[in-house]
Swiss-Prot record:
UniProt name for this protein: Probable inactive receptor kinase At3g02880
Protein's UniProt keywords contain Cell membrane: no
Signal peptide as annotated in the record: 1-23
Comment block on domains: The protein kinase domain is predicted to be catalytically inactive.
Membrane topology: Multi-pass membrane protein
Phylogenetic lineage: Eukaryota, Viridiplantae, Streptophyta, Embryophyta, Tracheophyta
Major location category of this protein: membrane
Protein origin, superkingdom: Eukaryota
Residue stretches spanning the membrane: 253-273, 389-409
LRR repeat residue numbers: 91-112, 115-137, 139-161, 163-184, 185-206
Modified residues (Phosphoserine): 347, 424, 519, 621, 626
Residue numbers binding ATP: 351-359, 373
């Protein structure tokens, strides 16, 4: 009996001791978070200090009575992390402080985070050297320190992190060589630093974009100067001397050289004669200024602005039988009077190169400005081309870019549109990230989504088969007041399928096999991706879209299931948004519904437009830019 009583007392004692230990550990976590709060400022850190448990605080996640995750992305945090703060959260597995304004070094007591798996600190202003202790953490899987101010060398002990699959160090101030890294990494980027030297052979299989913006050499970049493609220096000091007999030329060799020179001279004269005849013919054709196509610019770089004057195109023919046609066919003349010669002589500026052709800004002397699209790979005959263009020219909507005129010949197909001064939504979302850039606020983004939805809904209302065919952010153009207008509508059927965009661009619906045959439900999918891009700030074509290599819709779905919808939003959007983002989440869910895997599960564009109108109206009237 006494034995049973002693056993019961022991069990009770152990249980009480366990509760006390758990309470003590949670209190230790609470003190650590308060230390962070005292050093770091930001809206989410207005935690309820009266609560005994930190597990209900914003961004804090607990498991078994301990803090296991701290997620405060894009929360406007600033200041430096203290010793005795995060480093004392010894059960922490996930730390996400990305896209804030935190500065200073990474605290040395991060070495205590032996269970840490995921470290996301990108998009801050952390400085100092990258501590080597990060690569001694036994559980670490992903490290993202991109877009900070880290300096010094990449630690030599990277290979100590045996479970590491992601290492992002781009856009810092790192210097020196890249150490040999033999880990089976799945994601890697050190671009836009001050690194130098040869790229280790273990990293040579990564794309150029992982290393650009440094002074590195070796695969996949240019060959290092010390390396010789032939394996040695030709004609170097170790080259054996030739025999003396080779210094003397035989009579046969001399005769061969003379004959070769004579033949070469005759060929040169023949070429000069042909060039002179061609030049005389071209002098009879009026000189024209024509823009030369340029390579497509990336979404993260500014498109170069330059005027290029080249040899005029071949003589324009108005039909495939060869009849001359120098006339533009106009749909709208309210933009101003001009003819083909005037258009080709106008001051031209390269805007970019897309999937259907190159675009230029044409400025006339009298002040008129238009946009010209030079189509490429047109595969339909003239009659079908003209019929198609007349259908497009008859369309009129406030959110469609106006098709002013077109020109058709065997060698040239030109479309003339109204010019949109603010450029494309893609350039604004993913272009210059400098201090002078003004980000789009919520009201403006909602207005852009609504304008684009109305335009596409109008296209679909023409009949049951009319679709846009190429919806993406670079085809959403903006006016001075940030009014959205949709461009490149209805052109997919007349362009070669090899030129039409494919699924790699991130907007294409999964059921599409022929890029020239896009259904209205496929348009809805592409528009859904556009909404997600507008709210997350992530390009669907970005290589580092997320850390699993999935497309944008699946990434949004995955994050919202594991965390909260707010975790996927563009930090530039949440930073300037007042408390409460219910309408943002509503629009995000509309975008997700549009990207349903099966076409029948997607709403119609009319329904999408109605839903966005409700969101927009409950948000108030749009303002163009953030305060």
């Amino acid at each position: 009996m006494k034995y049973k009583r002693k056993l019961s007392l022991s069990v009770v004692f152990l249980f009480v001791f366990y509760l006390a230990a758990v309470t003590s550990d949670l209190e230790s976590d609470r003190r650590a978070l308060l230390a962070v709060r005292n050093s770091v400022r930001g809206r989410p850190l207005l935690w309820n200090m009266s609560a005994s448990s930190p597990c209900n605080w914003h961004g804090v996640h607990c498991d078994a009575g301990r803090v296991t995750a701290l997620r405060l992305p894009g929360s406007g945090l600033f200041g430096s992390l203290p010793i005795g703060g995060i480093g004392n959260l010894t059960q922490l597995k996930t730390l996400s402080l990305r896209f804030n304004s935190l500065s200073g070094p990474i605290p040395s007591d991060f070495s205590n985070l032996v269970l840490l798996r995921y470290l996301y600190l990108q998009g801050n202003a952390f400085s100092g050297e990258i501590p080597s202790l990060l690569f001694t953490l036994p559980s670490i899987i992903r490290i993202n320190l991109g877009e900070n101010k880290f300096s010094g060398r990449i630690p030599d002990n990277v290979n100590s992190a045996t479970r590491l699959v992601t290492l992002y160090l781009e856009r810092n101030q790192l210097s020196g060589p890249i150490p040999e890294i033999t880990l089976p990494l799945q994601q890697f980027n050190v671009s836009s630093n001050q690194l130098n030297g040869s790229i280790p052979s273990s990293l040579s299989s990564w794309p150029r974009t992982a290393f650009e913006g440094n002074t590195l050499c070796g695969k996949p970049l240019d060959t290092c100067e010390a390396e010789s493609p032939n394996g040695g220096d030709a004609g170097g000091p170790n080259t054996p001397p030739e025999k003396k007999d080779s210094d003397k030329l035989s009579a046969g060799a001399i005769v061969g050289i003379v004959i070769g020179c004579v033949v070469g001279l005759l060929l040169l004269l023949l070429i000069l004669f042909c060039l002179c005849r061609k030049r005389k013919k071209e002098e009879n054709v009026p000189s024209r200024n024509v823009e030369a196509p340029v390579a497509a610019a990336t979404s993260s770089a500014a498109i170069p602005k330059e005027t290029v004057v080249v040899v005029p195109p071949a003589k324009a023919t108005g039909s495939e039988s060869g009849a001359v046609n120098k006339d533009l066919t106009f749909f709208v003349k309210s933009f101003g009077e001009f003819d083909l010669d005037g258009l080709l002589k106008a001051s031209a500026e390269v805007l970019g190169k897309g999937t259907v052709g190159s675009s230029y800004k044409a400025s006339f002397e009298h002040g008129l400005v238009v946009a010209v699209k030079r189509l490429r790979d047109v595969v339909v005959p003239e009659k079908e081309f003209r019929e198609r263009l007349h259908v497009l020219g008859s369309m009129s909507h406030a959110n469609l870019v106006t098709l002013i005129a077109y020109y058709f010949s065997r060698d040239e197909k030109l479309l003339v549109f109204e010019y949109m001064s603010k450029g494309s939504l893609s350039a604004i979302l993913h272009g210059n990230k400098g201090n002078g850039r003004t980000p789009l606020n919520w009201e403006t983004r909602a207005g852009i989504a609504l304008g684009a939805a109305r335009a596409i809904s109008y296209l679909h209302s023409r009949d049951g088969t009319t679709s846009h065919g190429n919806i993406k952010s670079s085809n959403i153009l903006l006016s001075d007041s940030y009014e959205a207008k949709v461009s490149d509508y209805g052109l997919a059927p007349i362009i070669s399928s090899t030129s039409a965009p494919n699924r790699i661009d991130g907007y294409r619906a999964p059921e599409i096999t022929d890029a020239r045959k896009i259904s209205q439900k496929a348009d809805v999918y592409s528009f859904g991706v556009l909404i997600l891009e507008l709210l997350t700030g992530k390009s669907p074509t970005h290589q580092q879209l997320n850390e699993e290599g999935v497309d944008l819709p699946r990434w949004v779905q995955s994050v919202t299931e594991q965390q909260t919808p707010s975790d996927v939003l563009d930090p530039e959007l949440t930073r300037y948004q007042p408390e409460g983002n219910e309408n943002i989440i509503r629009l995000l869910k509309i975008g997700m519904s549009c990207t349903a895997q099966f076409p029948d599960s997607r709403p119609s564009m009319a329904e999408v437009t109605r839903l966005i109108e409700e969101v927009s109206h409950s948000s108030g009237s749009p303002n163009p830019v953030s305060d």
